[in-house]
């Protein structure tokens, strides 16, 4: 089945499961991958296809506290995941290929391993793969809402209640075992992170961004990974080591090079996009990744493109872009942003 949804001179958008769509793309056709897969256990993006049951039914999964309690008593943890994929009113089954709703962490990690294996095939030998992942905590089964709780029945027995699960590093180490070089592990610090209601731990204010490559010799434009040096005026250097007399630093200091390496802690505020119900992803993040890790006139791929922020960054930097998503309405948002009907640089979403 043809997955192509939109195409212009530099943009190509596909609708479908990331793994299946990538299998149809030619090998060594992508120079850079920048992506943020749906985080495990965070939310349901509503991509299920209902089969059977009553077509007039307003389908609902069995996710009330009572249903969870009774299901827990009657079935094993593996079977519970399939029970919760049936409509509690008419019995229709929900078939869903979205990522992030896997029954266990191991299943989530394994699916990202499969996706990354296909990315390996698509990447050129010197290509770069930038993978943004968020961690989560293990909780008891309680409450309802659009944000799905990660329960103790869904995590390995060694992860205790309230424990941080280490999902980003579970994925990174799995990919390392599969041949990827984990070249960097950036901390994306979010100064304006959403308030955390927890009262017995510190608030979470960061996500991980991994730089993965196929070989030691890969494309990396170090000049695009620099930030300005501090002021070189004499008054800013009076208290240098060895003396504090102003006359000892009268002449300006001329730095070597254009700046210093930005390091592996990136402080970038989130900028939610009003029209897209997906995780905030500021355009500054893919811009830096693409500027540093994609050849000039190269091609960028985002297999979980959402509202297309990576695509906007690619276009602004003169690269072509391929995006994949299960939801065509997210592609529609991206197209509107390309056409200038929505802001392209203020409010961004992955």
Feature-to-residue mapping (PLM):
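S-adenosyl-L-methionine-dependent nucleic acid methyltransferase catalytic domains
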Residues: 1-217, 224, 231-350
């Amino acid at each position: 089945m043809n997955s192509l949804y939109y195409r212009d001179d530099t943009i190509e958008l596909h609708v479908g499961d990331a793994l299946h769509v990538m299998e149809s793309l030619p090998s060594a056709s992508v120079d850079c991958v920048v992506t943020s897969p749906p985080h495990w256990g965070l939310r349901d993006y509503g991509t299920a296809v209902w089969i059977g049951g009553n077509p007039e039914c307003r389908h609902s999964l069995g996710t009330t506290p009572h249903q969870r309690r009774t299901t827990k008593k009657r079935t094993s943890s593996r079977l519970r995941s399939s029970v919760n994929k049936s409509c509690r009113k008419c019995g229709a089954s929900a078939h869903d290929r979205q990522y992030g709703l896997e029954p266990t962490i191991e299943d989530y990690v394994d699916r990202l391993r499969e996706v990354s294996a296909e990315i390996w095939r698509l990447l050129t030998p010197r290509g770069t793969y930038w993978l943004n992942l968020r961690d989560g905590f293990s909780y008891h089964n309680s409450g309802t809402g659009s944000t799905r709780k990660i329960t103790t029945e869904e995590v390995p027995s060694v992860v205790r209640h309230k424990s941080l699960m280490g999902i980003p590093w579970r994925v990174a180490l799995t990919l390392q075992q599969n041949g990827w070089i984990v070249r960097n592990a950036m901390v994306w610090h979010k100064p304006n992170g959403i308030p955390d209601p927890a009262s017995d731990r510190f608030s979470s204010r960061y996500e991980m961004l991994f730089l993965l490559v196929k070989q030691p010799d890969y494309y990396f434009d170090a000049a695009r990974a620099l930030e300005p040096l501090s002021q070189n005026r004499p008054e800013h250097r009076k208290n240098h080591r060895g003396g504090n007399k102003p006359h000892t630093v009268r002449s300006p200091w001329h730095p070597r090079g254009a700046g210093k390496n930005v390091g592996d802690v990136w402080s970038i505020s989130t900028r939610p996009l009003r029209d897209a119900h997906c995780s905030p992803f500021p355009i500054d993040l893919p811009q830096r990744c693409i500027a540093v890790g994609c050849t000039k006139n190269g091609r960028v791929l985002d297999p979980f493109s959402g509202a297309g922020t990576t695509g906007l960054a690619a276009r602004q930097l003169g690269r072509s872009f391929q995006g994949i998503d299960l939801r065509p309405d997210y592609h529609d948002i991206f197209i509107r942003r390309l056409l200038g009907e929505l802001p392209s640089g203020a409010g961004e979403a992955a």
